[in-house]
């Protein structure tokens, strides 16, 4: 019985920390992506703290409509978790697709896509530095250098909003 109560208390504490932590970060840190400028800007309390060049999906114009279209989504999402180690160094996961996008894809009998990230470079590609931004090469993600990914990991807490604009 005591174990069950301890378990319930631990779950309650985790839920409270997650809820109140995301409320705090939502109002403080916002990531803005301007696809037309190929830039990612991080603001905290309304002040720009980082602006960096990015690569986008290989067909960047227009909103993402289905899996495999090479488009980077447009809209407002949440950074819902961090990936500390991955094929492309580190990554921040974006809450794409939302309910509306899932419904629209279902109507067209296609998959909306998933796995949209802000990520670094494969370790053996990192020497490219910002040269990677001359091409849009991802499948819909936003790519930055590994050094920039380290900064984003520090600056952008889980629960932060991300606004991706055309």
Outline where the language-model segments fall.
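Bacterial N-terminal signal peptides that target proteins for export
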Residues: 2-12
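Intrinsically disordered, low-complexity
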Residues: 25-67, 166
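N-terminal post-signal-peptidase region of extra-cytosolic proteins
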Residues: 26-29, 56-80, 99-104, 146-147
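A short, polar/charged loop/turn motif at coil->beta-strand junctions and beta-hairpin connectors
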Residues: 27, 48, 73, 86-88, ...
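Structural motif
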Residues: 37-39, 76, 115
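Exported/periplasmic cell-wall-interacting domains
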Residues: 83-166
